């Protein structure tokens, strides 16, 4: 950062006189492709689709923190997911199935690889580490995360 600040300061000292006397040359920016626009972010974008790759879901969790947050449903309740990681193994279970739930996190089968939930928040409760969540909410292998309250 210090090197960049020094280089920027030197370039600014060299360039400012040309800007002030009107002799600085302008360069048109290339228009090779149209300007990309991002879609408006909505709450429903945070719904985790466990049929997708676990790496994609982990990036979604990071990208939607703090708002609107990534979420799923378990037994008719919303579960927000605040921190997760990818386990480099292929699950045999159906996507959305809990593979393991212990102090290391909640392992969930995905379309490719396994997503491990480390920090979650059940609706009406505070944000907590997965092991604290599991002390009050019994998840077991075979339980399913859903894409609706059903």
Which positions does each model-derived feature cover?
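An anion-binding loop in the catalytic cleft
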Residues: 45, 50-150
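Generic alpha-helical structural context detector
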Residues: 2, 14-17, 39, 59-62, ...
């Amino acid at each position: 950062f210090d090197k960049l600040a020094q280089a920027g300061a030197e370039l600014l000292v060299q360039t400012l006189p040309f800007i002030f006397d009107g002799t600085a040359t302008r360069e048109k920016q290339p228009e090779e492709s149209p300007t990309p626009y991002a879609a408006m972010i909505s709450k429903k974008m945070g719904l985790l689709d466990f049929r997708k790759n676990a790496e994609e879901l982990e990036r979604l969790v990071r990208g939607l923190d703090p708002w609107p947050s990534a979420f799923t449903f378990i037994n008719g309740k919303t579960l927000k997911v605040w921190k997760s990681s990818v386990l480099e193994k292929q699950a045999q279970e159906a996507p959305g199935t809990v593979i393991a739930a212990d102090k290391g996190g909640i392992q969930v089968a995905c379309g490719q690889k396994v997503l491990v939930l480390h920090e979650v928040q059940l609706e009406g409760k505070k944000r907590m580490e997965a092991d604290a969540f599991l002390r009050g909410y019994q998840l077991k292998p075979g339980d399913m995360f859903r894409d609706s309250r059903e």
